[in-house]
Amino acid sequence: MKVIIGLGNIGKEYEKTRHNAGFIAIDLLLEKYKYNSIKEEFNSLVYTSIINNQKVLFVKPLTFMNNSGLTVKQIINFYKIDLNDLIVIHDDKDLNISRIQFKKDGSSAGHNGIKSIINNLNTQDFYRLRIGINKPANQWKIVDWVLSKFSDDELNLLKESFNNKSEFINDFTNNKTFTYLMNKYN
């Protein structure tokens, strides 16, 4: 079983915001890789798909970003998921818009959702797919920037870029190594 978790904040007011890039990515993946069922469990929406004969859970935590780690820990423990079978998708202000990059372990780099996951799993050793949202201009506070909405052009660019790399799911479900994914898609 594989688990792909997209980070974001719940609520209409957060739709299409930069901090919800993980939710946007999950929605794009679900358009391409149809799901068989959806249920609410562990404070999250869990969409179940079968891809390459492999069960895949696409997850959107229903907690706020700062508490995402609680959901991730519960899912990992309940389904007995090896961390090599987990990818967390999140926004990253240090990458340009439309830049999509795989990363293995490391610090949170100030991302509160990732910080929550690290704290709850007691490890930094999990795979991430970072989605660039650009650095804010000087007049922006970081918190205001990540909660601002993408422009239509930015959103289209992000969708196009992500869709071009969404084939990573096929490689991931065919048990390709994460190093392989980084070399192929970064």
UniProtKB/Swiss-Prot annotation:
Chain coiled-coil ranges: none
UniProt-listed Enzyme Commission number(s): 3.1.1.29
Site features described as Discriminates between blocked and unblocked aminoacyl-tRNA, chain residue numbers: 9
Lineage: superkingdom: Bacteria
Endpoints of the signal sequence: none
Function description: Hydrolyzes ribosome-free peptidyl-tRNAs (with 1 or more amino acids incorporated), which drop off the ribosome during protein synthesis, or as a result of ribosome stalling. Catalyzes the release of premature peptidyl moieties from peptidyl-tRNA molecules trapped in stalled 50S ribosomal subunits, and thus maintains levels of free tRNAs and 50S ribosomes.
Cross-referenced NCBIfam families: pth (TIGR00447)
Protein name: Peptidyl-tRNA hydrolase
Organism (species): Mycoplasma capricolum subsp. capricolum (strain California kid / ATCC 27343 / NCTC 10154)
Lineage, uppermost ranks: Bacteria, Bacillati, Mycoplasmatota, Mollicutes, Mycoplasmataceae
